[in-house]
Amino acid sequence: MSGRQIIGIHGLANKPEEVELAEFWHSSLQEGLEKNSGINIDALPFTSVYWANVLYPLPDTNYDAYRPAPAGALKTYEAGTLDSIRAGVGDVVGNGLDWLKEHFNLGALADGVLEAKLNDLSRYYEEEAIRDELRRRLRNTLLDHDGESIMLICHSMGTIIAYDVLRELGRARPNFRVAHLITIGSPLGMPHVKRKILQEWRTARTPTNVDRWDNLADKRDPVAIDVYLRGDYKANGRGVEVRDDLIFNDWGGINHKSYGYLRCPEM
């Protein structure tokens, strides 16, 4: 896989040590390739962009370690089996968490994730030094692999950081390209996030430097409140549109875990 690079950026809340999280992502991707496609690659060309230590002074020690999926657990999404109508989504700020709890019957686990999301998002948007550092880490990693065929996989809040960095690079480095952008469990459809994007970039569209954009979402994932981003983000000037794909996240809990997304058949 010479000349190709997979770059991953994690999402909300605190995380385990940097090396450990990278190993968990790598193992999840390997498992998905082997079980879903019969492809066995010992060492994927994978680089992890880690930013949890900007927001949290110490790594998380009470975390979900990667574990292989039970036999038969990795399934494609079957239309209708998980459907629940999510219409009229309100803004997830202020009492937005109460709105989500009332309409989607979210339990305590989902509450905690959403509260972490709101806190992390608030700091990203309100504290310039934090925002600049998170963007810098991803931007530098992307530019380190300029000229290679880059697959950029972003989870949760990492999709917001990635979107902003790609829009920045579209202006600053017009020849830079990402061959494949994959957003998983993304909050890019949240009204509050879309407003911030419009405030900074004036338009919501596929970044000009992206050749392909796939958005994977589980309808049970409360962070991916809007599973269909195509209606929110226009095509770029080369006609590249976001392609939405519903998936079945086998991890359980609130079905937001990155490992479940990374090993799903649609990935």
Residues of each region from the PLM?
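Lipid deacylating catalytic domains
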Residues: M1-A52, Y56-Y63, G96-I153, M157-M267
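A basic- and aromatic-enriched beta-loop-alpha substructure that forms the phosphate/nucleotide-
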Residues: V54-E102
